[in-house]
Amino acid sequence: MYLSPQEKDKLLIYLAAQLARDRRQRGLKLNYPEAVAYLSAAVLEGAREGKTVAQLMSEGLTWLTREDVMPGIPEMIPEIQVEATFPDGTKLVTLHHPIR
């Protein structure tokens, strides 16, 4: 099976996000790469489900809280930008201060 570089990136994000979901479910606080992967994968999945950019930007502010991550992580992530494929094309989704 051949995967393009973009498909490989999405697969790695999914894998890292799954690890982050598992750790969060066990009550562990997420570190920087886990939090970024968790949020990025949620954007990609939301786009795949047909949500709009505006919906994802709004919902993205509720996916993780300060209690879900290690101390200092919210300040390390002032924004996340994810290029996601929507039914009408590829768009850039930006989450500003996604961990509150």
Curated annotation (Swiss-Prot):
**Keywords per UniProt:** Cytoplasm, Hydrolase
Where, per UniProt, does this protein localize? Cytoplasm
**Cited CDD domains:** Urease_gamma
Q: In which pathway does it act?
A: Nitrogen metabolism; urea degradation; CO(2) and NH(3) from urea (urease route): step 1/1
Q: Does the keyword Membrane apply?
A: no
GO CC list: cytoplasm
Q: For this protein, what is the EC number?
A: 3.5.1.5
Q: In which family does this protein belong, per the annotation?
A: Belongs to the urease gamma subunit family.
Annotated protein name in UniProt: Urease subunit gamma
Q: What is the species listed in this Swiss-Prot or TrEMBL entry? A: Synechococcus sp. (strain JA-2-3B'a(2-13)) (Cyanobacteria bacterium Yellowstone B-Prime)
